[in-house]
Amino acid sequence: MKADIHPVYEAITATCSCGNVIETRSTLAKPLSLDVCNECHPFYTGKQKTLDVGGRVDKFKSRFGAFGATKKA
């Protein structure tokens, strides 16, 4: 391998928009700003909203279910 071709892997601080500061290591070599982190992301805070409006199969059956029905004489 060639010597001195790899970037320096240094400790940096990543600051979230909520104010949380995370110490990590990177080759970026400058402070990093984040939009979300584990302290403010809705999935990790329990404030996630789930939208259950019916699946694709239910929608398909409601639109095309009558086409496969047999007719009574």
From Swiss-Prot:
**Any single Gene Ontology cellular-component annotation:** ribonucleoprotein complex
**PROSITE patterns, A to Z:** RIBOSOMAL_L31
Q: Name one GO biological process term.
A: translation
Cofactor annotation remark: Binds 1 zinc ion per subunit.
> Any keyword RNA-binding?
yes
What SUPFAM superfamilies is this protein classified in?
L28p-like
Q: Which domain of life is it from?
A: Bacteria
Q: Name one GO molecular function term.
A: structural constituent of ribosome
Cofactor(s) annotated in UniProt: Zn(2+)
**Pfam families for this protein:** Ribosomal_L31 (PF01197)
Binding-site list for Zn(2+): C16, C18, C37, C40
Q: Zinc: is it a keyword of this entry?
A: yes
Name the InterPro entries for this protein: Ribosomal_bL28/bL31-like_sf (IPR034704), Ribosomal_bL31 (IPR002150), Ribosomal_bL31_A (IPR027491), Ribosomal_bL31_sf (IPR042105)
Name the keywords, alphabetized. Metal-binding, Ribonucleoprotein, Ribosomal protein, RNA-binding, rRNA-binding, Zinc
- What is annotated about its quaternary structure and interactions? Part of the 50S ribosomal subunit.
* Function recorded in the entry: Binds the 23S rRNA.
Q: Can you tell me which family this protein belongs to?
A: Belongs to the bacterial ribosomal protein bL31 family. Type A subfamily.
Q: What PANTHER family does this protein map onto?
A: 50S RIBOSOMAL PROTEIN L31, CHLOROPLASTIC, LARGE RIBOSOMAL SUBUNIT PROTEIN BL31A
Q: Tell me the protein's name.
A: Large ribosomal subunit protein bL31
Q: Coding gene?
A: rpmE
